[in-house]
Regions:
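Extracellular/periplasmic carbohydrate-active domains that bind, remodel
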Residues: 2-473
């Protein structure tokens, strides 16, 4: 239900009254979280204490079909620039909410946020759109100096996307646009901690066009009823963002636990426990022809992956357009993956411990190798070699995977991983050190390799029968 103009007026007035009245109870204090043991290369900007008398306690509506979006919006407007928002009740958001104007504000979420699922096609039309992989979001947060936190020692502190109806609908309409649960978009200097996220229709989080972000002590889970398949439930995706730390969190999902999308730099992921995922993934990259994707300076430390398709994973589209899924196709992009380290990585029943592919989404491996993550560009006008083309590459270089242990699943036993590059000059300095992953049969683990320097790997390679990484998201 969308609020009328009169309803909006009284909702806004109610927030003002609540904010100005003396409060009879304390609020949960802002947690003192720090990146540890690693940071993203620069300390987070200082976030000063908020004014103790500028507090907005948000009062939800009483109607079960209400829309609390406007009430929340007016609270943020009132307590912006030095105040604190308290969301300690149960709220229903039924329309998109743009919170990209935030400055110097804390948000205490000890209640519950639910997104209205009565009409999934309403959100397909009205959610905020990203010009990347057909993504959209219920609400988006941007600005500077923002702290969002809850209290995991008690019930509540929940953001619920009510994804079940979306998952059910895409069984018959795979082109349905499903919103993500949360977006930082254009945020500078923010923390998010001690919250529960549940049942996102699509990705849980995107961190886009943002810098200096710290995510800590989060609990992300999806659960389907009646056997409906959960789709695209990435934990975090970073996109065009710099200096991000994601740490000390638990993720139970069915897609990438963390995914570094184009132009993600100086990012640390540490102390995560992921179950059911597709790995800690670089990419996919190179999806859009002639676009440059750069991912570099990543450190992934002390991560446990269980019951997943992949552990450490790098996925790059080939140098030719390919159709993959109903809303996902591409190839022919440019760029590089550089200086990525996976360190202290635990595998528990994962199909593959290591996956590197430059043929993502392409089932025809021969065709992929004929177009090795590059796109032909016209020669300069003065060039005499008019019968040839210049090659602009998407390369993978300076990758280290070390201190990896645990077990794979029985699915591909005795194979434990694949490292497949589309051409010898597209991958360089890929190293594996102290890899002690075992397979269930007790046989020697096998790794399928192509176009990588096997002298830098701490295991023996076999020739690949084919690159599996064409059917997973």
């Amino acid at each position: 239900m969308r609020l009328s103009a009169i309803g909006l007026y009284f909702s806004a007035l109610a927030v003002g009254l609540v904010a100005s009245l003396p409060q009879h109870h304390d609020i949960h204090p802002r947690p003192n979280i720090k990146p540890a043991p690693f940071d993203a290369g620069k300390a987070l900007p200082y976030s000063p204490p908020r004014h103790p008398k500028r507090r907005c306690f948000v009062r939800p509506g009483a109607d079960a079909t209400r829309d609390d979006a406007r009430v929340i919006y007016h609270a943020f407007k009132e307590c912006n620039n030095g105040g604190t928002i308290i969301l300690d009740q149960t709220y229903l958001i039924s329309s998109p909410l743009d919170l990209t104007f935030l400055r110097h504000i804390d948000v205490v979420l000890t209640g519950e946020i639910h997104f209205d699922d009565s009409d999934v096609y309403y959100w397909a039309e009205n959610s905020f759109k990203f010009n990347f992989q057909n993504q959209s979001v219920f609400w988006k947060w941007g600005g500077e100096d923002v702290n969002i936190y809850g209290d995991l020692s008690k019930e509540g502190s929940v953001i619920d996307g009510r994804g079940q109806r979306y998952w059910k609908e895409i069984e018959t309409n795979k082109s349905l646009l499903r919103p993500m649960l949360f977006a930082f978009d254009g945020m500078k200097g923010a923390t998010m901690s001690n919250l529960r996220m549940r049942n996102t229709p699509n990705w849980f989080n995107i961190i886009a066009n943002s810098t200096d972000i710290l995510i800590s002590n989060m609990d992300l889970r999806v659960e389907s009823l009646d056997g409906v398949k959960i789709a695209n439930s990435d934990g975090w995706d970073t996109y065009r963002s710099d200096r991000v730390v994601i740490q000390d969190s638990v993720v139970l999902n069915t897609d990438d636990c963390v995914s570094f999308k184009p132009n993600s730099t100086n990012i640390v992921v540490q102390n995560l426990d992921c179950t059911g995922s597709h790995g800690i993934s670089v990419g996919s990259l190179g999806q859009y022809a002639n676009e440059t994707d750069i991912v570099e300076n990543l450190y992934i430390y002390n991560v446990s992956l269980a019951n997943s398709s992949d552990g450490a994973r790098i996925k790059v589209w080939p140098g030719i357009q390919t159709s993959f899924q109903a809303l996902l196709n591409g190839g022919g992009g440019l760029g590089r993956v550089k200086n990525v380290t996976y360190d202290l990585f635990r595998n528990v029943n994962n199909d593959r411990a290591i996956t590197i592919t430059q043929c993502y989404g392409q089932k025809n491996q021969t065709l992929c190798y004929e177009h090795p993550v590059s796109v032909p560009l016209p020669m300069k006008p003065k060039s005499k070699a008019r019968t040839h083309t210049q090659q602009a590459n998407l390369t993978i270089e300076d990758i280290t995977i070390k201190n990896m242990y645990g077990t794979t699943s029985e699915s591909l036993d005795p194979q434990a991983g694949t490292l497949i590059c589309s051409a010898p000059d597209r991958c360089s300095n890929i190293r594996a050190e102290n890899i002690t992953v075992r397979v269930p049969s007790g046989k020697e683990p096998l790794y399928a390799c192509k176009n990588v320097d096997e002298r830098l790997l701490g295991f023996d390679c076999t020739l690949p029968a084919g690159d599996r990484d064409v059917g997973q998201g």
